[in-house]
Amino acid sequence: MKKRISRIICTLLCCAPIAISAQTSEKITSPVNLYKEGKELFQEKNYAAAIPALKAFVKQKPTASLLQDAEYMLVSSAYELKDKNRIELLRKYLDCYPDTPYANRIYSLLASCYFYEGKYDEALALFNSTRLDLLGNEERDDRTYQLATCYMKTDNLKEAAIWFETLRASSPKYAKDCSYYLAYIRYTQKRYDEALKDFLPLQDDPKYKALVPYYIAEIYAIKKNYDKAQIVAQNYLSAYPNNEHAAEMYRILGDAYYHFGQYHQAVEAFTGYLDRDHSAPRRDALYMLGLSYYQTKVYSKAAEMLGQVTTTNDALTQNAYLHMGLSYLQLAEKNKARMAFEQAAASSANLQIKEQAAYNYALCLHETSYSAFGESVTAFEKFLNEFPTSPYAEKVSNYLVEVYMNTRSYEAALKSIERIAKPSAQIMEAKQKILFQLGTQSFANANFEQALQYLNQSI
């Protein structure tokens, strides 16, 4: 009997741990505990650890309300962990629960997903379906920053500025970022004083100190504060010689040297710009480099650089052609000079340059013409009619008189004089001589009536 009782007790003792273990396991994997564990981990932002518990809970087929909450935490965790299927999961959740109280946040998460993928129009559409003011403070600020950036990326700068301004006033976290983008927007809008005001405090900020000096220097150059532009550019190049903005800083430095009349330094700076900028260089930089070469008497380089400027019909092109012509004259390439002057004279962008170019064009024609009485006379006539009060008018008149008297083409000379609206005293004196010569020729040819007319006009 005692033996039997002992066996029963032994059996009970052996089975007790198994029963206790089963009860503990059931307690741990019960739907309530799985939900509680998953939710706690989710609230602690331990998303990777929350997912297994929440997935296990969903498999238990819980009540509809708890299932909706659990699946919300699962898709939110997928977003936070940058799951490659996060957009699909978020949209599927909205399809399953169109009336979910979490819809506002889900839309904001979807918008954020599209923002990070660079799909700014899609992101904006979803942000417009979201009430950002209903989100938590930190998330509200994050989404507001994304919304403002989306507007900027889609060129709606007015809306972008409104949202950046709003965020800057309420979020210390994004204050400097907002200041930078507001300054950038003002810069693109050519509101340079406002832009400069926001750029300047960011010069020592670790995130922006290698970026904002470019805009600061550029604004100083635009406002013709070349001394300040020079200082900013020099300091930047000393600190960041290989930065992506170094090329532009060399350009700005060249701009400053050019306007200081320090042409050798300008050539060096602009050369640094061209050596580092492998995209299409700016026309104004090529123009200033070309004129710097001209001022330093490197005429071949001047013509080469200025030739790259003449892509648009404007004042820059007109002056580039003029100085190309002047450079070619120094290189004794008169035909190239003539063609360049002709192009400059054809433009009315700047009448003073047009006048100088027209004079040089006529002079080149005169010096290169194979015909003694040809295109040069026509060019001189045109010049005197267009610029009768020009300081070059006397020289042009003298050239014409020289041609009239040396070629002995008196009838052609007379017609030429008659085409000049306001002939100078020199030309009128030449006209008298020409009429006398025509009169004597007619008399010698026994054309006495014609001779009398010419001689009477010559008196």
Name each model-derived stretch.
Residues 10-17:
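Bacterial N-terminal signal peptides
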